């Protein structure tokens, strides 16, 4: 008998637990779910809902789930960044799905925002530096609070912006700051 899908909801739960995810954790998820194969539910909404449900089930009510919602395509444009409406750019369908959840919060950064849900999501994403990776940034809060990076279907060199935070803090000679001016619309 040929199976018509590669994995199930139970497989998602088992896999997340196998890599060490557990209750009350805060996690930062970068993903390309297309790399995982065919899911038992054939709809895009079913796939996204179940991955988010699995993550929520594992981290529980005291955990937090964060995703990248960067919109780097706004750099050097006249487009206005809107906290609620501006979509992420090339960050994956799970990121966009989480961004659109009613209970999600997004950091106010026009180019490198992060979105999250959970008991402390607002704390992590509010009152951050205007420099995307410097002291006072989301990344500093992630480091200070042991947020776990989870890469799904993405090579680590494309999925760990935390490295840029470390490079900025340490002051490596090959990084430099480049300022961009961007109009920001709705901030609520």
What are these regions (language model features)?
Residues 1-188:
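N-terminal and secondary-structure boundary signal
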């Amino acid at each position: 008998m040929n199976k018509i899908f590669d994995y199930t909801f139970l497989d998602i739960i088992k896999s997340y637990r196998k890599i060490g995810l557990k209750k009350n954790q805060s996690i930062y998820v970068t993903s390309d779910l297309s790399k995982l194969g065919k899911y038992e539910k054939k709809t895009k909404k079913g796939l996204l809902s179940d991955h988010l449900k699995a993550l929520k089930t594992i981290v529980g009510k005291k955990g937090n789930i964060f995703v990248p919602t960067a919109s780097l395509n706004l750099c050097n444009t006249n487009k206005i960044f809107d906290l609620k409406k501006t979509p992420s750019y090339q960050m994956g369908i799970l990121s966009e799905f989480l961004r659109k959840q009613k209970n999600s919060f997004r950091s106010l950064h026009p180019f490198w925002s992060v979105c999250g849900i959970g008991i402390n999501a607002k704390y992590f994403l509010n009152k951050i530096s205007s420099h995307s990776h410097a002291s006072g940034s989301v990344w500093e809060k992630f480091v200070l609070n042991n947020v776990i990076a989870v890469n799904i279907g993405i090579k680590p060199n494309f999925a760990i912006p935390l490295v840029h935070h470390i490079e900025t803090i340490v002051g490596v000679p090959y990084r430099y700051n480049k300022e961009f001016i961007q109009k920001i619309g709705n901030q609520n």
